[in-house]
């Protein structure tokens, strides 16, 4: 299950890369449940030797996400990613909620976590999240189960790194492992290059100046302008496992009806 990479912009000069995995087995099981057939057969073929029928239930089919699928996925979970970075990784929530979860255990996000993120605030009722549960996998690793149009498992590989990231976003003074964040990996968006046409230098020998009166065709090169804007790449902090993808709605063009005379 090779991942595909998508990036989500979480600040003016910062992008969060997401490694997106497709859980093929889970998607096939979900399709069987939605079709109301527990033993749904995908392919049937007769066997010529004894006229029996071969049924294949799990063919070796590659399931992948298109660029439009990844864009729709990132657009849907962007608000929840910002909620994870800015609120869930706060020191108060880590110490009072996340650290209380034992390794291998889960808790309801909507009941036990979301109300504490905005406790005492006037906008707590206006905040919506589609994260259903939080499971602690290791000391700093957590799994968030997300279900809306997409059904996902969002893996936080290190809540400690996200807490440091939140500190940088809030106060612009973050260091990672003793190095400045500006020394970390960056994403190159574009750069600016300008080339001016150059006139070749001609050497005159033995008084042949009259032979050089003919016009010289200059190799004029176009001026190409680019803009360079450095963006900080945060590395592999969050992984997304796709469990269910919404159906693609095909746009069908309606046939033109004949105009009434």
Swiss-Prot record:
Gene Ontology biological process terms from the UniProt entry: double-strand break repair via single-strand annealing, removal of nonhomologous ends
One of the record's GO cellular component terms: endonuclease complex
Superkingdom field: Eukaryota
Main location: nucleus
UniProt-annotated location(s): Nucleus
Remaining remarks: Present with 1170 molecules/cell in log phase SD medium.
Protein role: Catalyzes 3'-non-homologous tail removal of RAD1/RAD10-dependent single-strand annealing recombination intermediates. Plays a key role in targeting RAD1/RAD10 complex to 3'-flap cleavage substrate in recombination. Also contributes to the integrity of ribosomal DNA arrays.
Subunit structure and binding partners: Interacts with MSH2, MSH3, RAD1, RAD10, RAD51 and RAD52.
Protein's UniProt name: Single-strand annealing weakened protein 1
Phylogenetic classification of the source organism: Eukaryota, Fungi, Dikarya, Ascomycota, Saccharomycotina
